[in-house]
């Protein structure tokens, strides 16, 4: 009987929530981490307008809603909305009773302690889970790539981290966090499309720009060279059809938007680019393990999905590293979901079963138990 109850694995990202069952090779449910509330109250009585919508339903009704993301920069900032997202995950997406399944959640590196406690409290007290564990996202991505040592560049919708990991443990002193990720690139693309005369302003229109970004953007190997090519010919131009049938053309914006990952100054940020952040993280580690890190730079998250990003990263890090150093960039094809996949692997390991925090332990010790059991 013991065997049949699968653990749930939920990766709550700033942009998308990925959820499913431990042991599966992909998440069952992937939906936007958004909660939408009607902009205007229903006029027709009995139309059954809800006071809030979550995920895909919020996305499809976005024209009449105000959309909010409860997770910003990887960190939960609105617990009431977060609870709605979890409720939706359990009951509508996975269709499970949370009180029957152990639950593995993920968190951003350097997540504030209070957040970790609050997460633990909600899962046990609101949803009555029998067991719970929280794991760091980047560590799970590394597991998914079949490694226990390496440096993970995890870039999602809300935040980018470079996380050096040695023998399965993240090295907190060397973690770099960049508040520059997919959402910022979407905003930047909105801005540079405006310069072309296309206006996108509402939260609903921002979602259209996100789609343009995901379908058409790429990273140039040599940015200046690419700009020249774009200026001299129309070979890089692509067209995109808007929902109303209007067709827009996009040229150098295709690679100008993601270039901000390497040159954050384009967004008016003083941050290091992702290549420098990776290098700085490695340099904060012990000299003896740097070779292992340079040789295992693992990319994860949706913002690392641009064509050309791995080659560009290779070129940039090679230029920063000692000349004889072997640099290897690993960009697994499933990297959009590698955090979730790592969670699925971890939660189904027989050796992991003693790591869960049980409801009983929680009742005895309170939320603080999460620091003792989840490292």
From Swiss-Prot:
PROSITE patterns, alphabetized: ACTINS_1, ACTINS_2, ACTINS_ACT_LIKE
Entry EC number(s): 3.6.4.-
Its subcellular locations are: Cytoplasm, Cytoskeleton
| Pfam families from the UniProt entry | Actin
**Cysteine disulfide links:** none
Quickly give the catalysed reaction.
Answer: ATP + H2O = ADP + phosphate + H(+)
Task: Please give the function described in this protein's UniProt entry.
Answer: Actins are highly conserved proteins that are involved in various types of cell motility and are ubiquitously expressed in all eukaryotic cells.
Which family, according to UniProt?
A: Belongs to the actin family.
Protein name stated in the entry = Actin
> What is the taxonomic lineage of the source species?
Eukaryota, Fungi, Dikarya, Ascomycota, Taphrinomycotina
């Amino acid at each position: 009987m013991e065997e049949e109850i699968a653990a749930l694995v939920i990766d709550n990202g700033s942009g998308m929530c990925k959820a499913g069952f431990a042991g599966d090779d992909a998440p069952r449910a992937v939906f936007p981490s958004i909660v939408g509330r009607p902009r205007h109250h229903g006029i027709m009585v009995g139309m059954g307008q809800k006071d809030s919508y979550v995920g895909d339903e919020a996305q499809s009704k976005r024209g009449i809603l105000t959309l909010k993301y409860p997770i910003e920069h990887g960190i939960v900032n609105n617990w009431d909305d977060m609870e709605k997202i979890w409720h939706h995950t359990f009951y509508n997406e996975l269709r499970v009773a949370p009180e029957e399944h152990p639950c593995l959640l993920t968190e951003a590196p350097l997540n504030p302690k209070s957040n970790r406690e609050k997460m633990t409290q909600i899962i046990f007290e609101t949803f009555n889970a029998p067991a719970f564990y929280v794991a760091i996202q980047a560590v799970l991505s590394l597991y998914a790539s079949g490694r226990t040592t390496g440096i993970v560049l995890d870039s999602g919708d809300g935040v980018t981290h470079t996380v050096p990991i040695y023998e399965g443990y993240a090295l907190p002193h060397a973690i770099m966090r960049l508040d520059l990720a997919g959402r910022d690139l979407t905003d930047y693309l909105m801005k540079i499309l405006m310069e072309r005369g296309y206006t996108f302003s509402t939260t609903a229109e921002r979602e259209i720009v996100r789609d343009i970004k995901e379908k058409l953007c790429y990273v140039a190997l040599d940015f200046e060279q690419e700009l020249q090519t774009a200026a001299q010919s129309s070979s890089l131009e692509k067209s995109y059809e808007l929902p109303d049938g209007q067709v827009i053309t996009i040229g150098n914006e295709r690679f100008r938007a993601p270039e901000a990952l390497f040159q954050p100054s384009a967004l008016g940020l003083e941050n290091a680019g992702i290549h420098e952040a990776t290098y700085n993280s490695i340099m904060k580690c012990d000299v003896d393990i740097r070779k292992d890190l340079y040789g295992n730079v693992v990319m994860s998250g949706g913002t690392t999905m641009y064509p050309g990003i791995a080659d560009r990263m290779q070129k940039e890090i090679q230029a920063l590293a000692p000349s004889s150093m072997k640099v290897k960039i690993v960009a697994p094809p499933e990297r959009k979901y590698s955090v979730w996949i790592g969670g699925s692997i971890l939660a189904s390991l027989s050796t992991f079963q003693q790591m869960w925090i049980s409801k009983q332990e929680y009742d005895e010790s309170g939320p603080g138990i999460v620091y003792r059991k989840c490292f």
